[in-house]
A protein has these predicted regions:
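OB-fold ssDNA-binding interfaces and closely related basic DNA-contact patches used
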Residues: 1-159, 206-211, 220-227, 263-264
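Polar/charged alpha-helical tracts
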Residues: 49-52, 63, 129, 176, ...
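Extended serine/threonine-enriched, polar tracts that run as long, contiguous segments within proteins
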Residues: 142-220
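Accessory, usually C-terminal, subdomains that scaffold auxiliary metal cofactors
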Residues: 185, 189, 194, 198-263
């Protein structure tokens, strides 16, 4: 009997990819050894790592991080690169944010990195409603916004909580997933979510056509997450919601231009 069969009370349909469903809702501790070392860790100092989709320009790829390759996922906290393939996990919490990362382009002259975790007020340019750098198109020159609106999905996985982001070309895919959830009358964590990687052509400003990787999200409505795991997800949700409300829901790559906002 495998370890999963020995501990899991739920055996969903076999998944061909990276199955990150946390079949054990609580971390496994060595027998008779209590969890120690958290006494002096401030909850406000804790950050949620991101599960980033790598591209050819991603720092991990250009720096030659082991196994890093376009189209694969990397855990920003441990720099663990997952095997090639789709991912299955459980979405727990959602929030929208805005992010602006200056590029080597005249449009970004004298601009600074600005991140609005709550989608309301940025770290540099203040209220997003007044700034509009992440939402307003340059219709005269047919240019997209300088920054980007971002869908942030905090997920419960066997690697711990992670943030999965969808922006720019994958923003609509994230919106479609949200619409499915909203119309269902269910919690995100009622069913597992499959994150698929797709390869699509993209025409560069030079006219050259290249391939880029994008994300699609699908709710596995044929699989019901068992009550015990849903309760664990709900407890995590309450913690995340409180952090978001107080402005403390942060990721350890929020200040990095390679955070995934502008790469998809």
């Amino acid at each position: 009997m495998s370890k999963k069969e020995a501990v899991a009370v739920w055996t969903p349909k076999e998944f061909k990819g990276n199955d990150l469903i946390p079949y054990e809702a609580a971390p496994v501790q060595v027998a008779n050894i209590p969890l120690v070392g958290n006494d002096n860790i401030d909850a406000n100092d804790m950050v949620v790592p991101a599960l980033n989709l790598l591209h050819g320009t991603s720092k991990a790829v250009t720096d030659g991080v082991e196994d890093a390759a376009p189209g694969r996922f990397m855990h920003s906290g441990t720099e663990q690169v997952l095997p090639e393939g789709d991912v299955r996990l459980i979405v727990v919490h959602y929030h929208k944010s805005n992010a602006l990362f200056p590029k080597e382009d005249d449009r970004y002259a004298n601009l600074e990195t600005c991140i609005a975790q709550d989608g309301i007020e940025g770290t540099v340019y203040g209220l997003c409603e007044e700034c509009k750098k992440c939402t307003e198109w340059d219709n005269v020159n047919s240019k997209p916004p300088l920054g980007a609106e971002v869908h942030n999905f905090v997920c419960m996985t066997s690697l711990g909580p992670v943030i999965l982001r969808m922006s720019r070309s994958t923003f609509k895919a994230g919106s479609k997933f949200l619409s499915t959830k909203a119309s269902s009358g269910k919690n995100f964590f009622a069913h597992p979510t499959v994150v698929r990687v797709t390869q699509e052509p993209k025409t560069l400003p030079t006219g050259k056509v290249t391939n880029y990787y994008a994300l699609q999200m699908a709710w596995q409505t044929t699989e019901d997450v068992p009550e015990g795991l849903q309760l664990a997800a709900y407890e995590l949700y309450k913690s995340l919601a409180q952090k978001h409300e107080t402005g403390n829901l942060k990721s350890n790559d929020d200040a990095a231009a390679d955070a995934g906002f502008e790469l998809d």
